[in-house]
Every structure is written in C-alpha cells, then in structure tokens.
C-alpha cells in the first residue's frame, strides 16, 4: 500500500473549495467533457455519465456506468490524511490504512486481500496522502455484491478486530516501508527536510505522510480506536462504483449493507494555511546513497483549485520542460551542469508548493547550479514565451486527461477526488476549462507573484564527504537515522490463530459472504493483422472507448546485437532518435510533437528497440508522420549525442549507489556469467559509454534498422483500413534488408546454491534477489509454472511469501516471486527488501517456505488459484496497454489470438499433483543464486547459517567503470 500513490495526477492541479452540504438524496447528472485543442479548431467530445446520491448516514455514493468490459471498480475514499494528525503521532493515517486491510468481523482473517485472491480482483490496495485515504480494486462484475459487503464491513465492523499483537506487527511492516522508500534511497530524506523548513512548526504539512519511526512505534491501540471513531465514519467518506453493473441492484445492496452504520460527529474542513517565508533557508545533508549532488528550491504556492494554480501549472512546465525551456537551455545546454531539470506546481487541500529539482553531474558545485537557475529566470523575464509555447502545454494536458480515463478505476479516482475536494464530481469540466483559459499575462503575473525574488527553501543533498559542493550559507539539516545492529527481531509479537473480540451488533447476519452474480463472459478482442510489402507485420485492435490511439513499432535486436566490449550503443541511439531529424532541429521536433498533444518515445531493451506513440485519434496521422521522420531521417546531432552521453553517465553513477539497481545489475551478472551480452545493463557501463562514438550509433542503425525485424501493434479509435492507408509512406520509403539475430548459449541453472553478498555500508535494508535462469515463455511448462507460483509468491497478499514474511513476521514491506521470459530463457526470481537486522531470518524463512511448498500445497490452494486466474480474465483486456501486450505476445511468439483460451483450459485442468511436481522442479532452493545487497559488516557472516557455504563478497566483481 503506497503512501503517495499519485494515480490521480490526470489533471495537474486540484484545489480547495468551501464545503457545502448536499441535501438532495439522489441526483442524476451528466458531465460533458468538451475540450478544445488549442492548436486546432477541432473539438473532441467525451462525456462521463454519473449518478450521485447520499445515504441518511452521510455516505456519498457515485455511480458511473461503462459496459465495455465485464468489470467493476470500487473505490472507498475517506477525507482524512496526515494533515489530521498531531505532532508525536505522525504517520498514523498511513498506519491506519494498513490496518484496515487486515481483518474485519465478517470478512475474517486476511480481510479483503484474502477475498480478492479468490474473486479475481486486480489486487486490493490503498494509498494515503496529506488530505485523503483511499481503498480500491477492480473486480469481475459478478463479485460486486461481495465488494459492497466487504467495504461496509471494513467501515462499520472493523475496529474490534485490532489487537495489540496486530498493531505491533503492522508497525513493523510500515517501518519497513519507510526504510525501503525513504531511509535506504538516494535523496529519500529531501522531502522531510523541505517540508520541515517550508512550513512552520505544527503546520499539518510540516511532517511526512509516512511519519517517523519513533512516532510509529509509539502509536497505541487507543490511538487506533480514537482515529477510527473520529474519521472513519460514513459522513466523511465517498463510495464510487464504476463499470459494468446494474444500478438499481447496486443501490439495494448499498442500502442493505451501509444504511445501519451510524453517522459520526460532524467534521469541519481545515482552513487554508499557505506557507509563508520571511527569508530564504538553505540546508544541506550528506547522503550515504547519493552519487550526484542534488539541488532543490521550493517556494510557497497555493492550495487546491486556487485561481492561480492553473497558471502556475503552465508556468512551471514552460520554465523546465523541453528544449525551449530556459532552465533546460541554461543548465543543460549552455552550462552543462546537469542532464535534466524538473519543476512542478504541487497543490494540496490547504497549501501548496512550487518545486525545482535537479541532480547535477558528479562533482558539480551547487552554487554554480543556483546561479544558472537565476540566469534562466532572467532569460525568461527578458524573452518571455510565444502563444505556440502556451498552446503546446495545453495540448499535452488534453491528451493526458484522456489517458487517465483508460480504466474504470481511473474514472472512479477522478470522481471521488473532485467530490471530496470540490464537493462536486462534475467540477472536472470547469477545472479543465480553467487550465485552457490561462493567458500569457496570467503566467507572467504568477511568475512575478510567487517566484521572482521570492524567498525559498533550498536543500543541497551531496554524496558523503563532498560538503564542498553545497550552497554557501547552508546549515546542516536535522535528519534522524536508524542505527544498524547485527541482529534482532524488533518488537516481539505473537499473532493468535483466531482473534477474540466483541461483535458489533447488526440487524441481520453479515457473517455469510454474498454469492456471485451471473458469471461474466469476457470477450477476446478481435485482432486484425497484415504484412506490408516491405516485410513489416502489423497487428491491430479497434477500441472506441476513448478518442485515443496508442501504437508501437518494435524491432528485434536491442542489446543482443551489441558487442559486449561496447555496450550501450542501442540505448544511446534510441535516445538520440528523438533529438531532431534531418529536417527538424531538436527544438522543432519537440514542438511539433507537443502541439499535437502527442507522446513519442524510443527506448532500447535487452532484445528490442521500441518506438511508441500515443495521441488523440484525430491527430494520429500527423503523429505517425513524425514517427516516420524520426525513424527514417535521423539527425545524428553531435551536440545532442554528447549531452546524451553525459546524461547516461550520470544515470550510471547514480545506479552505482542505489541498492535496488545494484541488486538487479549484480543478479544479471550472476545469472548469465560475466561476459554474456545479457549480463549487461542496456545503458552500458562508464567505460563503454565514454568510448562510444557517433559512428557506432550510425553503424548500428544502418545494419540493424529494418522492417524485416519489425512488428507494429496498434490499439484505439481507428479501423484497419485507416491504419493500412496511413502506413503507405512508411511501406514505400523503409526498405527491407536482412538482419541476423544471433542465438546465444544460455547457462544452465546452478547445480547447488551459493550465497553472494554485495556490501553497501550502513544500508538500512537488505535487498534480496534469489533465483536462477529458468525457461522461455514459449516453454510448455512456463504458464503452468506461473500457475504454481501464484500461491508461492505471485498472488500478492494471498501468497505464502507475503503471508509469512510480511503478515506473519513483519520483516518486509513486500516480497514477490515470479517467472519472466521471452523467446529466450528468463529467470525465476524472488525479490524483497527486508529490515537489515533480520536479513538471515528472512532468507532462512524463504528457504523453509520453498522446501515445504510442494508438500503443503493443498486442494484449497489449488481451488483458490483456479478461481482467481479464471475470474481475473474478465479484466485482462480492459486498457489499451493490456491490448498492446496481447498483440506483442501474438507477434513475438507466433501465438494465435485465442491463446488466452488455451491458458484458461490449462488452469481448469491442472491438478494438485502437477503443481507439486512443478514446485519441486522449478522452485528448488538448493539450486539457486542467493544474492543479498546490504551491510556486510553486520549481516554477511550470519548468512553462512543457511547451509550453502561461506557467503561470497561480489563487490570486487565490478571494478571502477565496469
């Protein structure tokens, strides 16, 4: 459950409106989203129908009907976040989010997670922000009554199930989340330092959503009950149901399960409390995990829906986004201080902030960076910007708006967000129009009002021992760091088999889970395919739910076509392809893309290079024309090539200190062997990237860029004939040539297990990567092994690994296992981040689970696995991304479009004996690589107790630059 899962960033601003009471019990509303592209006269019309009604206890309910797929999203949002906490109990709103998933009186042990594992849900989850907490998942529509019953149980019949032991265990889980996302990450403490200094002491935004380790540990059971009784009440909640369902039936269920939950005390909205600075503040911190000096500059901003929020959104993008932006021109191109500058306007319910973030090249003095920022601002004041600049920003907002509506869950999030913070789900229409109405004068006015010459908070986060790089007159930031000890289990707790509690009275028996509705019959999308005269294969699916088209052109090769002594060529080439064409400068190409509101990206992977495009349907042909120009008329700009190399080297430097990146890169070396091409990261190494020339890129392009190894996949509001006609120029101009895709010998799985350790001194967590090189996705056992893995580690909260290491012991925030592969063998891997002082205990428990799994896999496990995998098929083609993935499987592996039915047949017929044998064969703990990335001084020697011999320190495998 993420602390800040910004799934709602569809519209770039949200702001506060005064609360008003809805007295209408039921209202039928239609919001017509009419968005005018600022670069064209055409309009795209799209409407979202919704119905809103309010129960007598104050629960606000919103329905949105969408019958395009047999799925329904359910989102329950509470108007409470960390801003409602008090000092000394920070992190409590987020802790409570975790607790609400664990158990309720009638759902029983495992709560919604356990039910989700049976009904085919997309994974029950939640998120906490400063101002709201939400709980959500998408389910097949036959499970809607079950979800309504479950959400009501969580709201009204939960609190008695929380015991001292339950609270103690979940504290450990949340503290692990903080270690993983904050304490063990480069720049993880930056937001803490900024907020503590931007807002005055006691301000609701002066502490972090996740809180402090000390405050989390001090939370009491009475705190939990008080928080629940105050904030988790119907009159502080919004329930959204979106998807394919019967409205009248859903209303009956909602009344049945929610009506008798009592209304809580009335809740007054928080008053706006904008930040205010009398003078600038400068802080610094020596970061153990940073390899690049980072500068943040943060100014006080405005709250949600403030009239100036819209112009500030556009201002920050004009200043930092793209090659015409003054910050990019000065810091990246002129001064060569960094590869990227990020600037954004952030709005919360009662205040906001305007942030600038840049990570400079290694060894760069941040005083030079600050001077360059000021120079960029001066340039903006002198030169301003054009109407076309303004229009391209607005065009991007329009496309992003529609992209955010691709799933019923995305629509549910929007409706809930606007209902809570604007008291009107339909405010989204006005919100967009306010963005589109921003003028040049508005932008310059807010620049002068909020940025120019105004005080700010600046933070210098530098690698340890490099304080010579910090801003002058900076004071050391106060950051509390956890001390690492050799071993220990943290707070002890014992979770009973059954929790004893007093039942909450109800007018009817809630203990029986409702039955399924009519079983949905998901339709497999109709696929069309053709081969162009030049040899490129094209696969498509028509989908008219949204006025969008998404497509990709994939060329076999990528890293596999590179020389191991010169890796990184395909990655640099992919990056350079969007940096201008023969007929367009980098700035002109970027502007042409943005004026269409389109997105075009090129990226290189281990086995392919992909050109991906996304646009409004009306702009598809113009977007494709730009893709054609990018592919066939590269610019090979020497200046852009050098900038791309600098950026890549900076990325490599940062990865060298990130424990998760270290784990991934080291695991691949151990899987494939040091000299195998697939053991390398596609971005290359310091040594190889420094030596790559522009001629290397041209040679790679001239040799390997051919329609003979290309497939196109396209999904959206466009038919087959239109697509084929649009490809005529590419078919004619792109000539076929033979490209040889090499076949590599793949190493065998190890005959015995070995423990490897990569030392990251003072790491607050240990990153685990256990596994071996298994099989390709085309192997007959691949999907069967995936079925086997569901209960082991692929089923989220339903899996053994999660239940034991997270729910049972509190060792980790998350752990998973899975098979990955393509037409060549991929690994089986187990990955997690665990508290440092239980590194051995975690590894030993994983080993035990693997050893016992074949013999302990039960008929009930098999039935739950089958139920989930069969029922979850209802939602597997909901989004354009999932449809593109289907087309990729068909084109890459030669599968028929109905391969999904074959997989369903496999699920239905697999037996317990087969699963047990698959586990013995493909999840054998005695034939694996056991890699740990963490603090060797306190943890490495203990791992010899696993019984796999003395751990091998692998830092020496990676010499400087390699």
Question: What are these language model-derived features?
Answer:
Residues 38-60, 246-287, 294, 329, ...:
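Proteolytic maturation boundary segments
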Residues 25-35:
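Bacterial N-terminal signal peptides
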Residues 152-162, 257-265, 374-384, 630-636, ...:
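A common structural junction motif
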């Amino acid at each position: 459950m993420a602390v800040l899962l910004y799934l709602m960033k569809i519209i770039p601003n949200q702001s506060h409106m005064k609360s008003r009471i809805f007295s209408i019990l039921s209202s039928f509303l239609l919001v017509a989203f009419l968005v005018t592209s600022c670069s064209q006269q055409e309009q795209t019309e799209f409407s979202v129908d919704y119905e809103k009604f309010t129960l007598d206890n104050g629960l606000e309910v919103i329905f949105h009907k969408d019958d395009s797929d047999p799925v329904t999203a359910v989102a329950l949002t509470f108007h409470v976040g960390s801003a409602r906490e008090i000092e000394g109990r920070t992190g409590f709103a987020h802790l409570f989010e975790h607790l609400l998933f664990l158990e309720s009186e009638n759902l029983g042990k495992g709560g919604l997670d356990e039910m989700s594992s049976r009904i085919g849900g997309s994974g029950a989850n939640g998120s906490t922000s400063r101002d709201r907490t939400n709980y959500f998942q998408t389910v097949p529509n036959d499970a809607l009554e079950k979800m309504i019953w479950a959400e009501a149980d969580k709201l009204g019949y939960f609190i008695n199930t929380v015991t001292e032991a339950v609270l103690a265990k979940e504290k450990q889980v949340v503290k692990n989340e903080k270690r993983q996302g904050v304490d063990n990450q480069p720049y993880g403490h930056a937001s803490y330092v900024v907020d503590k200094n931007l807002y005055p002491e006691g301000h609701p935004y002066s502490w972090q959503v996740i809180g402090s380790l000390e405050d989390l540990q001090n939370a009491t059971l009475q705190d939990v009950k008080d928080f629940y009784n105050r904030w988790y009440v119907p009159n502080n909640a919004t329930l959204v149901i979106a998807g394919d369902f019967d409205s009248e039936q859903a209303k009956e269920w909602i009344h049945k399960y929610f009506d008798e939950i009592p209304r809580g005390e009335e809740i007054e909205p928080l008053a706006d409390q904008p930040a205010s600075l009398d003078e600038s503040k400068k802080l610094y911190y020596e970061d153990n995990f940073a390899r690049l000096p980072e500068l943040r500059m943060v100014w006080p901003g405005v709250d949600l829906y403030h009239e100036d929020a819209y112009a500030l959104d556009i201002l920050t993008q004009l200043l930092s986004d793209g090659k015409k932006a003054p910050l990019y021109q000065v810091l990246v191109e002129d001064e060569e201080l960094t590869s990227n500058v990020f600037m954004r306007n952030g709005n919360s319910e009662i205040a906001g902030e305007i942030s600038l973030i840049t990570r400079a090249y290694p060894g760069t003095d941040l005083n030079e960076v600050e001077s360059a920022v000021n120079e960029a601002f001066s340039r903006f004041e002198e030169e301003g910007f054009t109407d076309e600049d303004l229009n391209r920003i607005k065009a991007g907002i329009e496309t992003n708006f529609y992209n955010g509506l691709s799933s019923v869950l995305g629509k549910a999030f929007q409706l809930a967000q606007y209902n809570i913070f604007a008291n009107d789900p339909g405010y989204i229409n006005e919100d967009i129009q306010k963005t589109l109405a921003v003028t040049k004068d508005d932008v310059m006015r807010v620049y002068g009002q909020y940025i120019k010459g105004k005080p700010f908070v600046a933070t210098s986060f530098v690698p340890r021992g490099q304080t010579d790089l910090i801003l002058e007159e900076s004071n050391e930031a106060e950051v509390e760091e956890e001390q690492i000890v050799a071993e220990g289990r943290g707070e002890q707790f014992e979770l009973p088999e059954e929790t004893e509690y007093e039942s909450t009275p109800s007018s009817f028996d809630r203990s029986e889970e409702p039955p399924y509705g009519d079983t949905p019959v998901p339709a497999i999308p109709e696929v069309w395919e053709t081969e162009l005269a030049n040899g490129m294969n094209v696969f498509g699916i028509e989908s008219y739910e949204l006025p969008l088209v998404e497509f990709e052109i994939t060329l076999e090769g990528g890293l596999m076509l590179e020389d191991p002594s010169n890796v990184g060529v395909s990655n640099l080439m992919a990056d350079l392809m969007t940096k201008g064409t023969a007929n367009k400068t980098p700035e002109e190409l970027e502007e042409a893309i943005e004026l269409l509101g389109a997105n075009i990206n090129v990226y290189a992977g281990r086995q392919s290079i992909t050109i991906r495009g996304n646009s409004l349907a009306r702009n598809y042909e113009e977007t494709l024309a730009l893709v054609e120009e990018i592919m066939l008329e590269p610019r090979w700009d020497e200046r852009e090539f050098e900038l791309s190399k600098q950026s890549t080297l900076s990325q490599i430097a940062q990865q060298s200190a990130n424990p998760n990146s270290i784990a991934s890169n080291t695991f691949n070396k151990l899987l494939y062997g040091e000299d195998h091409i697939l053991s390398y990261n596609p971005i290359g190494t310091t040594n190889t990237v420094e030596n790559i020339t522009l001629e290397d890129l041209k040679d790679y392009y001239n040799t390997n860029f051919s329609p003979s190894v290309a497939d196109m996949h396209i999904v959206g509001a466009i038919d087959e004939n239109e697509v084929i006609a649009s490809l005529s120029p590419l078919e004619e101009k792109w000539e076929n040539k033979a490209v040889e895709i090499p076949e590599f010998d793949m190493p065998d799985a190890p005959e015995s297990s070995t423990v490897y350790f990569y030392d990251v001194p003072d790491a607050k967590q240990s990153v685990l990567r256990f596994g071996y090189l298994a099989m390709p996705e085309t192997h007959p056992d691949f999907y069967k092994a995936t079925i086997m893995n569901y209960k082991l580690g692929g089923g989220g909260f339903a899996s053994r690994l999660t239940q034991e290491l997270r729910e049972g012991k509190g060792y980790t925030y998350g752990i998973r296992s899975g098979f990955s592969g393509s037409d060549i063998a991929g690994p089986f891997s187990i990955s997690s981040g665990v508290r440092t002082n239980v590194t051995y205990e975690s590894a030993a428990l994983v080993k035990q689970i693997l050893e016992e799994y074949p013999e302990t896999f039960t008929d009930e496990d098999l039935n739950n696995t089958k139920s989930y995998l069969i029922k979850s098929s209802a939602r597997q083609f909901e989004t354009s991304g999932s449809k593109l993935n289907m087309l990729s499987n068909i084109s890459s592996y030669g599968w028929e479009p109905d391969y999904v039915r074959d997989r369903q047949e496999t699920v239905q017929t697999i037996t317990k004996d087969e699963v047990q044998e698959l586990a013995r064969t493909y999840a054998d703990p005695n034939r694996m690589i056991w890699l740990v990335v963490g603090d060797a001084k306190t943890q490495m020697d203990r791992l010899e107790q696993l019984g796999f011999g003395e751990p091998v320190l692998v830092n020496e495998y990676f010499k400087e630059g390699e």
